[in-house]
């Protein structure tokens, strides 16, 4: 479905799928849990899911003759780290807006982890006190205008690379990649579990798996704590992406499966249950998840498995999207492990 779109390679290639034997057994052994390791997808500043999206956005940035990538996220945004990394790799400047999306007060929160890496890679990082919102932000639009006023040529990439005309394409490719891996494995996954916030990862998967009738087998775990806005954004991105790739099927609201039970108490703030999920996965599989995204989707996967959401014998693919550098901003929460 993606043959007609330009792609700038930023990743190693297909990401590995591994069976989480010990976690599956710990949760009763009735469900086979696998992980697709998007967190291991590149040598660019620890990688992660945003690179798969950016592979289809960067050709447009280069064609526009831009000299500066301009993007936005929270203080510990994985996305802005990846924008800084890609800018360094392709020889562009980088302007980042880091908003106060998370009510978290670790003493070094704005000096370690993702934001530190962005600074090391040369990005112009600006902290802004505005709160969480997955939509288009005034501070980002202002940054774009400031780059222009200084004589630069900005290329605007929204939060999560999501509300961008090509934002959903990368995860259509994820679905196509999984189908090829399923052919090698000799079975198909019954469910795909993914964390959902700005929406284009989920939306791209939804479109990609709609091609073989599995759109509603993509189970989004909300991490935004604003689920109505998130669900609407997933639907909008999916519908736009379906048109772009000429899916030939309509995407409707019921195709967006979003479970809202695990985002509490706020975006970016881990509950005790999220922290326990992070510890459990680390101690059983040495697979590191973060407090903002993957810890919450892992909490959801664990709880849904224990509740019997997945039928006995189901094969569940957990999409590990990355994000471990953010753990550095939560050192006090994990000071005892």
From Swiss-Prot:
Homotrimer. It catalyses: 1-aminocyclopropane-1-carboxylate + H2O = 2-oxobutanoate + NH4(+). Keywords: Hydrolase, Pyridoxal phosphate. The keyword Secreted does not apply. The active site is at 77 (nucleophile). This is 1-aminocyclopropane-1-carboxylate deaminase. Catalyzes a cyclopropane ring-opening reaction, the irreversible conversion of 1-aminocyclopropane-1-carboxylate (ACC) to ammonia and alpha-ketobutyrate. Allows growth on ACC as a nitrogen source. GO terms for molecular function: 1-aminocyclopropane-1-carboxylate deaminase activity; D-cysteine desulfhydrase activity; pyridoxal phosphate binding. HAMAP family: ACC_deaminase. GO terms for biological process: 1-aminocyclopropane-1-carboxylate metabolic process; amine catabolic process. Disulfide bonds: none annotated. The keyword Hydrolase applies. Its cofactor is pyridoxal 5'-phosphate.
